[in-house]
Amino acid sequence: MTFPNVKFIGNKRVLSIQSSVSHGYVGNRSATFPLQLHEWEVDVVPTVHFSNHLGYGATRGSACIPEEVHDLLNALLQDNGIVYDAILTGFVPNHDIIQVIFDCVLAYKKDHPKVLWLLDPVMGDQGKMYVDTNVISTYKAMIPHAFAITPNAFEVEILTDIVIHTQMDAKRGLEKIYQLYGIQNAIITSFEVEESPGTLFCMGYSCEHGKPQLFLYQFPSLSGVFTGTGDLFSGLLLAKYREELDKRKHQQSDETKQTKRPTVLACAVGQVLSCMHTVLVNTKTYADEILLEDPKIASDEFLLSNARELRLIQSRTALLSKKSIYEAEFLPGFEEGEDV
């Protein structure tokens, strides 16, 4: 089927390319609902088809066939004249699929250079890889073409060979990302430092005003196991970034133009972290209540994972909030060409 030659003008439209599960909230299922709440039209292409995420202990399904992913992307990006405002890429299990995605997105960007490509280089967490190692070189080739990346601390280590134990390590990691890949926006979604137990940090930079401007958020760590948070972060970031950008475009007073403000990205990240805090509190509260009612669930991997699924629908009001409960700290930047 081919759509008429219509450009879908007037809607915010994103193509989300990541994992697909029938049950629960990871991958496309975690990113789609928040984006739709923010009035985005979301088209999805799966990279895997699973019954549920791997934390359940047992799952059915398989990785998609590269040719299938290519056909889907070709139909959406080339054949049907659909114009996307953004492309969101997440979990990709192997090199063959990630190469297909890279080729298709790069070809689309040549014809649509203004499309925002938000790349989450999903490779692993806490020292453990959960994709084929041969994706690393392709991710490194992709990053310079993206608008922004959202790695976790372990993924920064893979991309830079810098292990993050301190805030200075995180800054050095971001500086090396900037030097190696030249990307204009990067966020380490969360990391811990040895001297601050119970606290998580999020650090990023944006080149909105030319040189990279660094920002840092810190927020309390919640006990518990949460899955799909990285996918939620990237989906929300796209929504909040566009919202903040549109708001500033409509503020035309001379005073607004002359006022030096935090970058759009820094403001968006603060809103994302605030939204996610509410989602995780709601998720933890629900799981604790379920375990209190039936303590036997704690010994059943499937039921426990089910109780810990993100409470996205129940947090829909919070997901739309434009407030930030956290205050950004703005750090001295780094200069291009410095040794790391």
From Swiss-Prot:
* Enzyme class, first EC level, given as a word: transferase
Q: Where is ATP bound in this sequence?
A: 189-190, 218-230
Gene3D superfamilies of this UniProt entry?
Answer: 3.40.1190.20
Disulfide cysteine pairs (residue numbers): none
Q: Which cofactor does it need?
A: a divalent metal cation
- The signal sequence is none
> Record's Gene Ontology CC terms?
cytosol; nucleus
Q: Which PANTHER family match?
A: PYRIDOXAL KINASE
The Swiss-Prot or TrEMBL record describes its family as follows: Belongs to the pyridoxine kinase family.
Under what name is this protein listed? Putative pyridoxal kinase C18.10
Q: Which organism is it from?
A: Schizosaccharomyces pombe (strain 972 / ATCC 24843) (Fission yeast)
